[in-house]
Regions:
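Active-site entrance/lid segments in N-terminal catalytic domains of soluble metabolic enzymes
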Residues: 1-171
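Conserved active-site-proximal phosphate/metal-binding subdomains
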Residues: 124-179, 185-321
Length: 321
């Protein structure tokens, strides 16, 4: 990976898809691919060729995603790999404005709409589709988010996105499911989203601290050890704010000038002279269990994890069973 990142990532797409399909023969298997990634189009097309059921894409606006789907379909057809492609495509949006850009562009340029829309809110983990100022206005950049979050304001944004998606669904005489994400931890959270009009929810943080999660034990324990004061908003080289667990790594960011020793060619836009750290190196370190030397992304409720659970336990909790 270090020396041949692109080739390694392309191989990993097929490898991980095969592994997931063996675990869930009848399951829906998707890839989350960041628009900000270098070689984005190649990764999208490789996932389609691998057999992905859905591609979810954010960290930027996936305005050209339908084009890459069409290109992959044409390449597969010419190679004798089938006449049709089953892969669905879904943009991640965080505001009515970003949803409008995607829907209008896909409608005008490609004559289609998304198969699914994911609304990722300000309580999500990892990269956030909000400016730092917007996060402050929403009251989600404090340790006491449960009391400072202006939920009513963002709930109205969600309703607005759902209304907008509905207009395009009506135009195309189809159903476009809307899934909400970010800070969903309990059955009550799930039901609140359904009451807002969501067709489903996307949950990540709760599944990190499960037996089945393939993250290293030290990564899971970082969640369990964390307090709400440890969960902070940090600036990412991707150019977006991100939510993570404060640790020795983040304490050291900006303390001394950063010198890039090896470039993984991971981001389309990366100013190697000014970045505070290498995001790939930081994420790889934490994924390998070196959590004090890496970036540990998490949702706003990560501190609520008290023990390692099973996926079955988490699902029953979310469903209120």
């Amino acid at each position: 990976f270090a020396d041949h990142s692109l080739e390694a990532n392309l191989r990993a797409i097929g490898k991980e898809f095969k592994k997931a399909r063996e675990i869930a023969p009848e399951g829906v298997i998707g890839f989350n691919i960041m628009v900000a990634t270098k070689n984005y189009a190649m990764y999208v097309k490789e996932a389609i060729k691998a057999g992905a059921d859905i591609i979810i894409s954010g960290a930027g606006l996936p305005v050209s995603l339908p084009a890459y789907l069409a290109e992959a379909a044409a390449e597969m057809k010419s190679a004798g790999l089938g006449e049709t492609v089953k892969t669905k495509i879904a943009p991640i949006v965080s505001s009515v404005k970003s949803a409008m850009v995607i829907l209008k562009m896909w409608d005008r340029k490609f004559g289609r709409v998304p198969d699914l829309v994911v609304i990722e809110g300000p309580l999500a983990g990892g990269h956030l589709g909000f400016s730092r100022e917007s996060l402050t206005e929403l009251g989600v950049d404090t340790p006491d988010v449960e009391h400072t979050y202006h939920q009513d304001a963002y709930d109205e944004e969600i309703r607005g996105i759902i209304r907008l998606v509905g207009e395009y669904a009506e135009k195309y005489q189809t159903k476009i499911p809307v899934v909400t994400a970010g800070g969903i931890y309990s059955h009550e959270d799930v039901m609140h989203q359904i009451d807002l009009g969501a067709d489903g929810v996307q949950v990540a943080t709760r599944f990190v601290t499960t037996v089945e999660c393939d993250a290293p034990e030290e990564f899971k324990q970082a969640y369990i050890r964390s307090s709400k004061e440890d969960i902070v908003i940090t600036k990412s080289p991707v150019g977006m704010p991100g939510r993570a667990i404060h640790n020795a790594f983040l304490s050291g960011v900006g303390q001394t000038p950063f010198k890039l020793e090896h470039c993984y060619q991971c981001l389309e836009k990366c100013d190697k002279k000014t970045i505070p750290y290498c995001i790939t190196k930081a994420l790889v370190n934490s994924a390998e269990g070196h959590t004090e030397d890496g970036l540990v992304f998490c949702g706003s409720n990560a501190f609520r994890a008290e023990r390692i659970e099973t996926v079955d336990e988490v699902m029953k909790s979310l469903l209120g069973e």
